[in-house]
A protein has these predicted regions:
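Phosphate-binding site recognition
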Residues: 1-210
Length: 210
């Protein structure tokens, strides 16, 4: 199925990617609003490290991320089975091979709140590394999640270690009618409106029916 809509969201993310300085961008919104697919579209023409976190332990998350890093060419795969800590793992982002096209690397952490759940110190670790290392790297890091109140309070709020570090914030809202209607080119105008209204009534998220 063709990717429909989200033009403004993609434009905002692409503009962040083309900025000269390193980027730390937060993308959030309710579940099934289209965050992951939008990020997949963003990543299509870029060298990307896409890590989809799961509801797992810290050790399991680190093992999965380590495998992804080693596959991307990070040093250490010959003598490490996995990174011992998130501090070490995130530091190694700066040692990944430079993109072959001469551009910057895109690093996406999808469902980041799962990582914080398994290791509550992670926001502090990321803040320290961003301040001293990562903000000077040729990277765009995207922190994505569905736990909206958690992201707004624990990651973006004034009491968060990451407060003031975001270079971009995208709160994704439900797909507007004119975009959603494109999924049903053969529907009458009335049927398109009914399908959209039915979905809003059920979940407040049009993309669920689409």
């Amino acid at each position: 199925m063709a990717f429909i809509g989200r033009d403004d969201d993609l434009k905002q993310l692409q503009e962040c990617f083309t900025e000269r300085r390193a980027q730390l961008v937060f993308v959030y919104g309710r579940r099934r609003v289209g965050k992951t697919e939008t990020l997949i579209q963003l990543a299509k023409d870029k060298e990307t490290l896409f890590f989809a976190a799961q509801n797992a332990t810290k050790d399991e998350q680190l093992a999965s991320f380590s495998r992804l890093m080693f596959e991307a060419g990070a040093p250490g795969k010959d003598y490490l089975s996995q990174y011992p800590s998130w501090e070490r793992a995130l530091t190694e982002l700066t040692r990944l091979p430079e993109p072959s096209d001469g551009g910057r690397r895109l690093v996406i952490f999808d469902e980041f709140p799962y990582l914080v759940k398994s290791d509550p110190s992670l926001p502090s670790v990321l803040q320290n590394l961003w301040d001293h290392t990562l903000r000077h790297a040729n990277l765009m890091i995207v922190i994505c999640g569905s736990a909206m109140s958690f992201i707004e309070k624990e990651l973006l709020g004034e009491k968060s270690p990451l407060y003031g570090r975001a270079t971009g914030i995208l709160k994704m809202l439900p797909m507007p009618y004119w975009d959603a209607a494109q999924f049903f080119p053969n529907y009458s105008s009335e049927d398109k409106a009914l399908a959209y209204a039915r979905c809003l009534f059920r979940s407040a998220t049009p993309l669920l029916v689409l």
